[in-house]
Amino acid sequence: MIIVTGGAGFIGSNIVKALNDIGYTDILVVDNLKDGTKFVNLVDLNIADYMDKEDFQVQIMSGEEFGEVEAVFHEGACSSTTEWDGKYMMDNNYQYSKELLHYCLEREIPFLYASSAATYGGRTSDFIESREYEKPLNVYGYSKFLFDEYVRQILPEANSQITGFRYFNVYGPREGHKGSMASVAFHLNTQLNNGESPKLFEGSENFKRDFIYVGDVAAVNLWFWQNGVSGIFNCGTGRAESFQAVADAALAFHKKGSIEYIPFPEKLKGRYQAFTQADLTNLRAAGYDKPFKTVAEGVAEYMAWLNRDA
C-alpha cells in the first residue's frame, strides 16, 4: 500500500494520478473532506481506501499498522499563505508532520513530503537549500521551514528515505477547490470563460516566478521514491517567467480577450514574493535529469484540460 496524505488536494491527487499511471491502485488517501468539492479530484482515479485526517492521526499516534506500506507521500497541510492562525498552522503543518515522520522512521517506510519555496521569504536570488538563504515571510513559510530544520537534524541518522520538496509556483489540473489560492492560470481561464477581461496586477511583467506544472511535480516525487534518494530539494523549473507570460499563454489558447491591469493590494505589500527561481543544482546532482515544461507549454496543456468539456 502507498499512503498519500492530502490525497484529495491539488498536488496529492496528481501524485495519486501518477501512481495510477504506473499501475498502482493500492493507495490510501488521507484528507479532510470538510470542503466536499475536493472529491472531484479523485473521481477519475483509482484508490483502495480513504481515511479522514484526524482518524489517521489518532492511528499514527497509537502506533496502529496499515499493513505493508511501501511509501508515504505527505502532501497534507494548510497551504494558505494568508492564514495567520499560528497555532492551527503549527499543529497542522509541523506537529502532524513530525508524528508521521517518526511513524515512518520506526518502520523504515520511505517518507516524501511537501516543503515550500515560501521558506526562502522575500529574496530575489540564491534560492538554495541551505539555512543562510531561508527567511520566511509568513507563518505558513515558517511552519515549513521549521519542519525542514527538524528533518535536517534527523537525516544523518535515518535508516530509511526522507525526502522534502520545496515546491515553487505549482499550477495545473485539480486545483479548482483552492479558491483564491489557485494559480493565476486557473483564475485567468475562469475570467476568460465568464466573458470578463483577465486581470493582472500592475507591473506584472516585472513579477517573475518559477512556475512549475503539477505533472512535473508528481514526476519528481515518483522518481525520488523509485530511486531512494534522501534530502531536501527545490522543485521548480530553474526558470523565472513573468505573470505576463502566463496571461499571454492563456490568451493564446482562448484566442480572445485583453488584460486589465489592477492596482497592487496594500495588504500584500512586503509579504509578497515578487521573484522566485529554483536553484536546481542539488536536484540535478541527485540524478534527476528530466526537462520541465515552460510556461507556454504547461499553460497550454492546462487550458486544454480545463476546457476539455467545453
From Swiss-Prot:
Catalyzes the interconversion between ADP-D-glycero-beta-D-manno-heptose and ADP-L-glycero-beta-D-manno-heptose via an epimerization at carbon 6 of the heptose. This is ADP-L-glycero-D-manno-heptose-6-epimerase. One of its GO terms (molecular function) is ADP-glyceromanno-heptose 6-epimerase activity. Keywords: Carbohydrate metabolism, Isomerase, NADP. It comes from the Bacteria. It catalyses: ADP-D-glycero-beta-D-manno-heptose = ADP-L-glycero-beta-D-manno-heptose. Pathway: Nucleotide-sugar biosynthesis; ADP-L-glycero-beta-D-manno-heptose biosynthesis; ADP-L-glycero-beta-D-manno-heptose from D-glycero-beta-D-manno-heptose 7-phosphate: step 4/4. Gene3D superfamilies: NAD(P)-binding Rossmann-like Domain (3.40.50.720), UDP-galactose 4-epimerase, domain 1 (3.90.25.10). The keyword NADP applies. Homopentamer. The gene is hldD.
